[in-house]
């Protein structure tokens, strides 16, 4: 695909990170299936702006949140971000879902990988996210414990001094 070949154009601009996160959570609050899952944004995250492709950031976060909603039947899903070394923003979607077995975590970003054949989807979402994140100069990963939940994360370059 164009994304995997690095042939996709990025439309860069200044992005108010907390505002973007609030917008994404508001959108997903309307898509939530039941009230047993709380969807929230961690408001303790710092007020920053980044030079990024807003739509691509939303695309990755939306994929993470869609997956979290599929696999979390009760508890919470939290969108947060942190500054790392004043040069990276680390976005994270943490859920209290069923988690991913250790032996399957390394495969999850491969194309056509679906860990649950009963769940709708082609198994391309995380592979596309990985390509987009790499194209934007970041890294992507997951930290998960089976039966406890997962944290899907990605990093994006940050230039210090761009606080709001």
Where do the model's predicted regions map?
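Short helix-loop "hinge" at the ATP-lid/N-box region of the Bergerat-fold HATPase_c
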Residues: 68-69
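Short alpha-helical Gxxx[C/S/T] motif in the catalytic ATP-binding
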Residues: 125, 129
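Short conserved segment of the HATPase_c
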Residues: 100-112, 152
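Conserved catalytic submotifs in the C-terminal HATPase_c
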Residues: 11-16, 33, 38-48
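A conserved beta-strand-to-alpha-helix junction within the catalytic ATP-binding
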Residues: 11-26, 58
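Helix-loop junction within the histidine kinase core
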Residues: 1-12
